Amino acid sequence: YTTLFRSERKNPGYVANRQFPGQGAWKDIKAKLSGMSPLEQVKAVNVLINRWPYRTDMDVWGVMDYWETPVEFFQKSGDCEDFAIAKYFALRDLGFPASQMRIVVLKDTLRNLDHAVTAVYLDGDAWILDNLSNAVLSHKRLSHYRPQFSVNEEYRWAHLTPSAPKKTGR
């Protein structure tokens, strides 16, 4: 992921003339979004990026796991972490600070699969942008998601599950 962040700085995916199917140029989309509240911007970005088709890394790159830059995502589409990355950088381009966002790799306990989402911290809550849904939900409503680690441009975090203390004998 560090290579991804460096690459995005050198060749940004969100350039003024980037075309979004059925939506026009990024500069025009960005102008429309600028009049919205931060949460409305988050919701609009989630819906916009979710229009791309889901494609596995094996189908696109011939490898099990590859984190795409937004430029690569817009050219080929991708899987869950690629959607999360594209959303993260769209929000960065809209002015959201890195400190308010994370790309979260998690375990979906309902489907028993690894998954990735974008988390945005607003108004004391973490809002989850997911390629599986156009609805942006509070993390509190997604108890089947167990975060494993998360990253942004500045930091990385390991998420640990607390365990009950073990009783010991005398």
Regions found by a protein language model. Name each.
Residues 89-144:
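Hydrophobic/aromatic-rich core segments of domains that either
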Residues 76-87, 91:
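Active-site nucleophilic cysteine motif
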Residues 1-4:
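Short, small-residue-biased leader/transition segments that mark boundaries at the very start
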Residues 19-73:
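Secondary-structure boundary elements
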Residues 125-170:
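His-Asp-centered catalytic microenvironments across diverse enzyme cores
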